[in-house]
Design a protein with these regions (language model features):
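Protein-protein interaction modules outside structured cores
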Residues: 50-51
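Intrinsic disorder/low-complexity segments enriched in polar/small residues
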Residues: 3-5, 24, 32
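Residue-level signal for mature regions of secreted extracellular proteins and peptides
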Residues: 43-44, 81
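N-terminal Sec-pathway targeting helices
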Residues: 1-12
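Hydrophobic membrane-insertion alpha-helices, especially the h-region
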Residues: 10-21
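Polar/charged, Gly/Pro-rich intrinsically disordered segments
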Residues: 24-26, 55-111, 135-185
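Ser/Thr/Pro/Gly-rich low-complexity linker/stalk segments immediately outside membranes or between
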Residues: 26-41
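Short, non-transmembrane amphipathic alpha-helical segments
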Residues: 116-138
């Protein structure tokens, strides 16, 4: 009998608590807060679909400026700027290119591939030039600088230095420390 009474009291208390809880929930207000949305039209929308393909495009003006600056450091060196992105290819064969990032390639002929101190100092000089390019001349986000240290056609060291990583983590490094920070044989 005692158990039955405890069960009844438990059920009544639970039902009362549930009823009170439901009564204290606030109903949604009639004033809905809607955030302002800014719509920016970039191109006229066409219903035509396209196929996306990774693509590269040359950046002739940026290439000339960087190549000239690199040749001032070493007349045997060369540099090239490339835009990386996507081609949107339509069914009629036409296409549009969307830039994702700007990448660079810098080549330096060398006599000895063990001069890591000199290579690191070269990287520092080139990265200082690249990071001083006005941001409005860089399309998309920062990409990378690919360094080629070439002894001959078969003997070379090639690796990439992500520009933003250099700015964030390595701009104060030089010499062998900078070289080894990015070169992973």
């Amino acid at each position: 009998m005692k158990n039955k009474r405890n069960w009844i009291i438990g059920i009544v208390l639970s039902a009362t608590a549930a009823f009170v809880a439901l009564q204290t929930v606030n109903a949604p207000s009639s004033e809905a807060i809607t955030p302002e949305v800014e719509v920016i039209a970039s191109e006229t929308f066409t219903n035509e679909t396209c196929a996306f393909m990774w693509a590269y495009q040359d950046a002739p003006e940026l290439t000339k400026n960087l190549d000239d600056a690199v040749k001032e450091l070493n007349p045997d060196a060369s540099a090239k700027a490339t835009l990386f992105g996507e081609d949107c290819i339509y069914s009629d064969g036409s296409k549009t290119f969307g830039v994702i990032e700007t990448d660079f390639t810098v080549r330096l002929p060398v006599g000895d591939l063990t001069q890591h101190e000199e290579f690191g100092n070269w990287i520092k000089q080139v990265m200082d030039i690249v990071t001083e390019i006005p941001r409005e001349e860089i399309q998309g986000k920062y990409g990378f600088v690919e360094f080629w240290f070439e002894k001959n056609e078969n003997e070379k060291i090639t690796f990439r230095v992500p520009i933003q990583k250099y700015i964030d983590e390595a701009k104060d490094k030089s010499g062998v420390e900078l070289f080894e920070y990015f070169y992973q044989p």
